[in-house]
């Protein structure tokens, strides 16, 4: 989907806020801890290349989901280490060596498939992924980890790191978190030779479990100023949201009592009302379940009336406003603010999803 710069809908990305968040988090973790910036999924909707370029001097490396995201960074001139967090296709090994990526190894079957195809592994760098309880990818048994490490090293692979991912670091109860931590520590203790980098701290762990940090952290959601727990846990220190979502009024009219709005005619005015149209819809990631949520116009909350369409929403105004008047969907307007977490709560989801779903049709503007 191509960006649509000739309409007023845009996402404003405060790169300085992201840098400040990295510095804030860095000030609260052990000195010497490596900082890996997670810029997968287009940097959580903020723009991977622009964000990575802005923060490259503040971090020690980057994490992405797949090899295509990694190639995008390299082709944009980013030279710092890039760890691919997901499982890569066998054919990606040659690309990883060519572009100097670090791959994740999550199972013996993957290694054996490479050996069966006689793939040249010499010079490849990898991190071993441990499934300590997340249940997605990773080794579960210490014996498998030892076997994998031996096989890889025998074939010229540099096993640089080992890591895991916590499922409940952003929740009130620490019980499952502690169980995962112990499983991970048990596997580490069983290894004959511990890799150079050991990391288990995602944003939530970095914020609320700083005492469990090994020697690297993966900064994701929090780097963009979002609370990984939503509204469950208070942040231990201030973070600055980096993304503002804005549009403008493109049509304003007064309708009589009884007038209906949107598909299905689900909203009917109970009196004469001022209705405005805003050019954003579910094709932009402003999903259909946002009906009845309020956006901000002139510092006032204005409800979305009628269903969210693919490209447009209709809102009820307290009075007529000129065409071009700013509409804030995420961010501050006057003395009011709408946060990504508030949007997520309304949708019964998480703030990660809210920002990641903002489609490429919305131009990103950086400052």
Swiss-Prot record:
Pathway membership, UniProt: Amino-acid biosynthesis; D-alanine biosynthesis; D-alanine from L-alanine: step 1/1
Cofactor(s), by name = pyridoxal 5'-phosphate
Q: Which GO terms describe its biological process?
A: D-alanine biosynthetic process; peptidoglycan biosynthetic process
Q: Which GO terms describe its molecular function?
A: alanine racemase activity; pyridoxal phosphate binding
Q: Which organism is this entry from?
A: Streptococcus pneumoniae (strain Hungary19A-6)
- Domain of life, source organism: Bacteria
Known EC number(s)?
5.1.1.1
Q: Indicate yes or no for the key word Translocase.
A: no
Question: What residues does substrate bind to?
Answer: 136, 310
Reactions accelerated catalytically? L-alanine = D-alanine
- Give one Pfam family: Ala_racemase_N
For this record, the Gene Ontology CC terms, alphabetical, are: cytosol
Write down what this protein is called. Alanine racemase
Please report which protein family the annotation says this sequence is part of. Answer: Belongs to the alanine racemase family.
Catalytic residue positions: 40 (proton acceptor), 263 (proton acceptor)
Q: Which Gene3D superfamilies match?
A: Alanine racemase, Lyase, Ornithine Decarboxylase, Chain A, domain 1
Question: What SUPFAM superfamilies has UniProt attached to this entry?
Answer: Alanine racemase C-terminal domain-like, PLP-binding barrel
InterPro entries (alphabetical): Ala_racemase, Ala_racemase/Decarboxylase_C, Ala_racemase_C, Ala_racemase_N, Ala_racemase_pyridoxalP-BS, PLP-binding_barrel
Role: Catalyzes the interconversion of L-alanine and D-alanine. May also act on other amino acids.
Any idea which UniProt keywords this protein has? Isomerase, Pyridoxal phosphate
Q: Which residues carry this modification: N6-(pyridoxal phosphate)lysine?
A: 40
